[in-house]
Design a protein with these regions (language model features):
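Conserved structured catalytic cores and adjacent interaction surfaces
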Residues: 154-162, 170
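Conserved small/polar residues in nucleotide/adenosyl-binding loops
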Residues: 176-183
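Generic non-transmembrane alpha-helix signal with a bias for helix starts/N-cap capping motifs
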Residues: 107-108, 177
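N-terminal segments that mediate ammonia production and transfer
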Residues: 1-107, 115-149, 154-155
């Protein structure tokens, strides 16, 4: 009987939080097999292995303190915000933005970098109800709309009389954006 424990996860932070050592990422199309005696086998299972990462992993699903495919999720999100800010400067040099507000939570790092690059204040304009889950993966449209209404509560002081740039991680289903617009 093997005396070792094994864990396999898509994010490094899971392994770290459970006290496991990160060994390596699996290659595209690679399978990992652990038999009943604890022996590990790696096998290429695809005829045409190709890395095709899901954009939502780094942008939305992954925790910012994770490494995925040897890329820091936190650093990736900071770079996205910086690049968006540079695009704003390039395409709209006379921009008038008083405040940058992230839609909680995963857009926070991008909003931080964007605000810093633009030289604009970063503010928390929404308080998130921690008991409402991810709204875009809820089963029906009615359920999603109801949950979005309950999910974000605006800090009206941060919106009143200001040109606000809202930063979100992605637009999968735009109910959150509609709610954010209604409240501001």
């Amino acid at each position: 009987m093997n005396k070792y424990e094994y864990a396999v996860a898509s994010e490094s932070v899971v392994l770290e939080s459970l006290g496991f050592e990160f060994v390596r990422d699996l290659s595209p199309g690679e399978g990992l097999f652990i038999d009943s005696s604890g022996s590990i086998f790696l096998e290429q299972c695809s005829d045409k292995p190709e890395l095709t990462p899901c954009i939502f992993e780094h942008v939305y699903f992954a925790r910012p303190d994770s490494m995925m495919d040897d890329i820091s999720v936190y650093k990736c999100r900071l770079r996205m915000g910086d690049r968006l800010a540079k695009k704003i400067i390039r395409t709209n040099p006379g921009y008038t933005i008083d405040v940058v507000i992230p839609i909680p939570d995963t857009s926070r790092q991008s909003a931080q970098a964007l605000a810093e690059t633009l030289g604009v204040k970063l503010r928390e304009g929404f308080m998130k109800n921690r008991y409402i889950g991810r709204t875009f993966i809820m089963p029906g449209q009615k359920e999603r709309k109801k949950s979005v209404r309950q999910k974000l509560s605006p800090v009206k002081l941060e919106f009143s009389g200001k040109n606000v740039l809202l930063v979100d991680d992605s637009i999968a289903v735009s109910y959150t954006h509609l709610r954010a617009h209604e409240t501001s």
